[in-house]
Amino acid sequence: QRQMCIRDRDKVDRALLARVRAKLAAIDADSISMSQESIAESMMDRRQWFNPFPRVRYTERPDAATASIMEGSIIVLVDNSPAAMILPTRFFDFVQETNDFYFPPLVGSYLRILRVVVFLLTLFITPVWYLLVQDPDLPNSALSFLAVTSEYEVPILAQLLLTEFIVDLLKLASLNTPSVFSNSFSMIGALVLGDFAVQAHWLVPEVLAYMAFVAIANFAQPSYELGYAFKLLRLVLLVSSAALGWVGLALGTLLIIVLLVTTRPIAGGHYMLSLIHISEPTRHAQIS
């Protein structure tokens, strides 16, 4: 298996480049034909199977790869794969998208801020709503519009968890459906299942509304891997909130913060360090 590193020799961190080369040289595999994630896993110093946060970015866009090189990043190309690996990768790299830079600065900043807000909403909206509806005084408070007014036989927590799994089921079914029917299948399947579940008192309309928002919001962020990381952490927050109430939500949030600050990128450094900056155009890139 062959790999190729592309970098700007005037901007790249030499120590970083040496680490990446050493990690690539240490990989002992006959072939990697299905995914670059196998290379990424082999390059990790510590394999944290319990940590869902992605530590590598992938792109198939030449402009995104070139912009990363200009910022001092390293691009790794692998045989049999159309995507390029971008190293190092920090958390805030997932907040921006290549298309943001094709808009005026004000619009691009607005889109990045909106993406951060969506990140937080998808993570906390269902656990916080669940805790609020468990409050018996909610119907008499200023937040009474959040209360569940329909009759239901399935506990709210079970409804939220069930809907999470149904959304993933529809995604998987759509992927395995011929492209001609995939969009229609997803839409009709969601409508039929949702209507039947409400009429059978399995789900309340409020649960469907919040989960529909979460499902749509997941497509507002550019990283598929980070979307599923937030999904798994949202499930952790739901379970901890159901078990310990607001204390469980606080403990779950603390766990997420600990995971973020202890995550180490493949090429070293800090995961939460923001590397977003504007660079001057580079003169050339060296290929080795």
Positions of PLM-derived features:
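Transmembrane alpha-helical segments that form the functional core of multipass membrane systems
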Residues: 90-237
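Residue-identity detector for glycine
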Residues: 26, 72, 108, 189, ...
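Positions that flank functional sites
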Residues: 39, 84, 185, 212, ...
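Hydrophobic alpha-helical transmembrane segments of membrane transport and translocation systems
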Residues: 205-207, 211-279, 283-288
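Cytosolic regulatory modules rich in charged/polar residues
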Residues: 1-3, 7-159, 268-269, 273-275, ...
